[in-house]
Amino acid sequence: MLYGKENRDEAEFLEPIFGSESEQVDLPKYKLAQQSIEPRVAYQLVQDEMLDEGNARLNLATFCQTYMEPEAVKLMSQTLEKNAIDKSEYPRTTEIENRCVNMIADLWNASEKEKFMGTSTIGSSEACMLGGMAMKFSWRKRAEKLGLDINAKKPNLVISSGYQVCWEKFCVYWDIEMREVPMDREHMSINLEKVMDYVDEYTIGVVGIMGITYTGRYDDIKALDNLIEEYNKQTDYKVYIHVDAASGGLYAPFVEPELEWDFRLKNVISINTSGHKYGLVYPGVGWVLWRDKKYLPEELIFKVSYLGGELPTMAINFSHSASQLIGQYYNFVRYGFDGYKAIHERTHKVAMYLAEEIEKTGMFEIMNDGAQLPIVCYKLKENSNRGWNLYDLADRLLMKGWQVPAYPLPKNLENEIIQRLVIRADFGMNMAFNYVQDMQEAIDALNKAHILFHQEPENKTYGFTH
């Protein structure tokens, strides 16, 4: 049979690429569309909007978990509609939250002689807010009892300049003076020689960080506890420690169980962590615990109806899905202590390997080698003979899909530009091999390229939001 040319214009108009004329309508962007469209078309249109987004697995900027097992995802998808705040309607979900709090308290060595308290949150930012509020209210009670004029000065919070931004928000929201202990090259975590200089009778508490966002290093919480203990012996205006363990809280107990940073220390009264970081759950879930209920002021606790009675709650957020709680409990049941330990130790090995390979290039100074948290940080050596900087390297790596942040360190070190690799449980050794190869190719390309490089007079942050 012979075929001739046909006019396809009309046929193409009547046969949209998704088999539906509704696809021909512009995708609503800033105003709600007038008409409905087919669900499969809506799905495809929205999915297409995200085609050029980065691959989360290759995002080495984020601490957040980017992979969970299909069984976990199935459980979580089956509980998306459950509102975790509805305690009486979903008593088993409430019990699961309670079990998670108890398991975490055990990991953090809560004493059987004390009555610990804890709650879930939607992340460590909310958990830090709760921990901070408890410190402020407790300080106010102690100060009033001792006759201190609480209106004479603004209360203050002492913390390393490597703090996570939620602490700045806390201080702004609740009118607290943030006293930052500066970092320097010799003190890449809280400076124990200077920290007590920032403490006075108006200090609501000192925050120790288990995993500084910029570098991944731990503050020496035990040494800080010793300093606080000596201070408290000499004054009636007691000061206590809140540990921001957003990253390290569900990592250190498995990898360094002998490290004393938790409720084993006398002056550590509260701790927060993120379940969606090294707790291995998708965002967002966090946890905050107090070593004893006396450190959690009653006025911060509210009562909700529960099985004909009342249940205490203190979360800032109200309605939120129970799915992340279910995901956390699944992981605790699935992995157990040994499973978490094995996963985190493998992640630790990957981080150490990457630090070694990056150092072998001879171009970088390792700022953090992943010996504690599996975070690798490095800067260009000052004497390295090159015409490019870390922002250029970040651009080049992005061409391969790798999202690697480059940013300045906090004040007092703001001229130090570093890159940071956050190694997560889903970043295996094979991916590490690929990264090393792609990084070397990127360096070779930059060394040979004849292009205009970044020459900004001011430092900037590239792909990094802490």
UniProtKB/Swiss-Prot annotation:
Top-level taxon of the source organism: Bacteria
Annotated EC: 4.1.1.15
GO BP terms in the entry: glutamate catabolic process
Inducing stimuli: Expression is highest at onset of stationary phase in presence of NaCl and glutamate, and at low pH. Chloride-dependent expression is activated by GadR.
UniProt entry tagged with the keyword Zinc-finger: no
Cited InterPro entries: Glutamate_decarboxylase, PyrdxlP-dep_de-COase, PyrdxlP-dep_Trfase, PyrdxlP-dep_Trfase_major
Required cofactor names: pyridoxal 5'-phosphate
Keyword line: Decarboxylase, Lyase, Pyridoxal phosphate
N6-(pyridoxal phosphate)lysine modified-residue sites: 277
Reaction catalyzed: L-glutamate + H(+) = 4-aminobutanoate + CO2
Top EC category: lyase
Keyword tRNA processing listed: no
MF terms in GO: aromatic-L-amino-acid decarboxylase activity; glutamate decarboxylase activity; pyridoxal phosphate binding
GO terms for cellular component: cytosol
PANTHER family noted in UniProt: GLUTAMATE DECARBOXYLASE (PTHR43321:SF3)
Similarity comment: family membership: Belongs to the group II decarboxylase family.
Role played: Converts internalized glutamate to GABA and increases the internal pH. Involved in glutamate-dependent acid resistance.
Protein name: Glutamate decarboxylase
